[in-house]
């Protein structure tokens, strides 16, 4: 019986998906494209989350977000990851550094609609 339990335990351990450690990310203003969903969920004011053409901006990740006028709400950000800690720096104007556990992220920016300057068709 003990042998059977040990064999079953070994099979479960061998078949378990390995826990993948996230690679460290040096500070950058341009995170990898495959990480944009993550970063733009928690740092939604960052300029790399928005595509602006002729002063009109669309969120690159969140299709349900409103189209907005390019304005000071969109900021330059630097993101990084080191030993499981993700951080984003809102600067140089705000000089605010946010840190969070990469596995348990929290947003520090909020879509304050009054600051977003939502684009309306009547603006043409």
UniProtKB/Swiss-Prot annotation:
Keywords: Glycoprotein, Signal. Residues 1-16 form the signal peptide. Glycans are attached at residues 76, 94. It holds the Pfam family v110. Transmembrane segments: none annotated. InterPro entries: ASFV_fam_110. Belongs to the asfivirus MGF 110 family. Plays a role in virus cell tropism, and may be required for efficient virus replication in macrophages. This is Protein MGF 110-8L. It comes from African swine fever virus (isolate Tick/Malawi/Lil 20-1/1983) (ASFV). The lineage of its organism: Viruses, Varidnaviria, Bamfordvirae, Nucleocytoviricota, Pokkesviricetes.
